[in-house]
Amino acid sequence: MDFNMKKLASDAGIFFTRAVQFTEEKFGQAEKTELDAHFESLLARADSTKNWTEKILRQTEVLLQPNPSARVEEFLYEKLDRKVPSRVTNGELLAQYMAEAASELGPTTPYGKTLIKVAEAEKHLGAAERDFIHTASINFLTPLRNFLEGDWKTISKERRLLQNRRLDLDASKARLKKAKAAEAKATTVPDFQETRPRNYILSASASALWNDEVDKAEQELRVAQTEFDRQAEVTRLLLEGISSTHVNHLRCLHEFIESQTTYYAQCYRHMLDLQKQLGRFPGTFVGTAEPASPPLSSTSPTTTAATMPMGPSVADLAPPGEAALRLEEVAPPASGTRKARVLYDYEAADSSELALLADELITVYSLPGMDPDWLIGERGNKKGKVPVTYLELLS
């Protein structure tokens, strides 16, 4: 108990000394040990890294989960070390509603059939979104969060300790300066009335007394300087580790972009497939009962847009008055053919398209007036339309 009281009194004295030194520095009444320029630049870079990492982390969380209530719920689950429950994505919820609507309104009607097809596509989009959120959380958010909750807390702790060591060092310098000034004054004009009781045997002169004070202050200064230098080196090593943090975050950023690219490619592929499937429904976009010759004024923009074909076909490229263009009669242009590598398997929807296998090489070219999302592909003596998104064009 006595030992604890002594330690408590010692800690209180150290805290008071640091508070006095800090206050005097703020008022310009005490000198302050300045860190070198390189150290200051390391501190500034570390602070900037921390601030921008926080902003990027928060905004990425908003991107992946726009609902603030859901983000708060996930945060609470993480703090309680509990597994975050699986959440239905908006696309999956929309798919569920569309499927239920098709079941109630009639799955055999044009509207019901279309609802079912769109529901399947929305379900695929929701699943792709779920995979993207999961991958981005692991490969990007988790490393950023680990830096803020791990490395940065260690750096902050060592910086606070360095600040305390600097205050101790400057307080020791101030104490030594005062002791030397008092010693010089006592040497010049000895005054035995200034001597005060000590825990050691008093010298017969005030000069000898202040000489002991100077020796003690110099010893304290050496200890404070050693501790400050040691702590400065520890903090410097941690701050220089920010470079490794940047390299790690760069790798994580590449992985995030890779997962985002995959996600959008999957979405685009699903929507292209949906567009082709809807284009095969002849009665999907036309009413069941139409006037034989509707008046021009009764045609609404909605009806006009609904009766438009979903996408161009090779037959659309035929000149007016001629039959549909036959692929076997299409000759490649004299220039403009390129080699392309197939990225994914592709099943031809009709005889005008060319089925593809992943990693095979084909020759591709474009014809005047073709949809920019499609090319003509040749493999041996076979040719047909191929989607651009399934290809990697080679130079």
Curated annotation (Swiss-Prot):
PANTHER family, A to Z: DREBRIN-LIKE PROTEIN-RELATED (PTHR14167:SF68), SH3 DOMAIN-CONTAINING (PTHR14167)
Segments forming domain BAR: 24-287
GO cellular-component term (any): membrane
Keywords for this protein: Acetylation, Coiled coil, Cytoplasm, Phosphoprotein, SH3 domain
InterPro entries: AH/BAR_dom_sf (IPR027267), BAR_dom (IPR004148), Endophilin_B2_SH3 (IPR035640), Endophilin_SH3RF (IPR050384), SH3-like_dom_sf (IPR036028), SH3_domain (IPR001452)
Keyword flag Cell membrane: no
Subunit relationships: Homodimer, and heterodimer with SH3GLB1.
Residues covered by the SH3 domain: 335-395
Biological processes annotated in GO: membrane organization
PROSITE patterns (alphabetical): BAR (PS51021), SH3 (PS50002)
Coiled-coil residue windows: 116-132, 206-240
Keyword Transport assigned: no
UniProt record similarity statement: Belongs to the endophilin family.
Region annotation (Membrane-binding amphipathic helix) ranges: 1-27
Chain positions found as N-acetylmethionine: 1
Sites of Phosphoserine modification: 10, 395
Protein name in UniProt: Endophilin-B2
Extent of the signal sequence: none
Compartments where located: Cytoplasm
